[in-house]
UniProtKB/Swiss-Prot annotation:
Keyword Chaperone assigned: yes
Localization: Cytoplasm
A single GO BP: chaperone cofactor-dependent protein refolding
Spans traversing the lipid bilayer: none
Protein name (database record): Co-chaperonin GroES
Keywords annotated in UniProt: Chaperone, Cytoplasm
Assembly and interaction partners: Heptamer of 7 subunits arranged in a ring. Interacts with the chaperonin GroEL.
UniProt entry tagged with the keyword Lyase: no
UniProt record similarity statement: Belongs to the GroES chaperonin family.
A GO CC term assigned to this protein in UniProt: cytoplasm
């Protein structure tokens, strides 16, 4: 798991993409130019949550270490401490794996 000193605000999360296989089950090697960006990742930081209508803090459903699925174009790509990461809102996450 990547370590970062970045703390997201509100309902944002920091996600590290999980790299896809470089070879198919049939043994065909996939070149970097043909690979799609993986839509699966691991959460490495979460914000405190959002506020409801009464001002109470509502915590996020995801936590650090969760493996999640998200849309192919979700989030903003950033590089922190030399690591490529995504910052996205919790609403961009489709679900938790496992």
């Amino acid at each position: 798991m990547a370590s970062t000193n970045f703390r997201p605000l509100h309902d944002r999360v920091v996600v590290k993409r999980v790299e896809s296989e470089e070879k198919t089950k049939g043994g065909i090697i996939i070149p970097d130019t043909a690979k799609e960006k993986p839509a699966e990742g691991e959460i490495i930081a979460v914000g405190p949550g959002t506020r409801d209508d009464k001002g109470a803090l509502v915590a996020l459903d995801v936590k650090v270490g969760d493996r999640v699925l998200f849309g192919k174009w979700s989030g903003t790509e950033v590089k922190l401490d030399g690591v490529d990461l995504l910052i996205m809102k919790e609403a961009d996450i489709m679900g938790v794996i496992g």
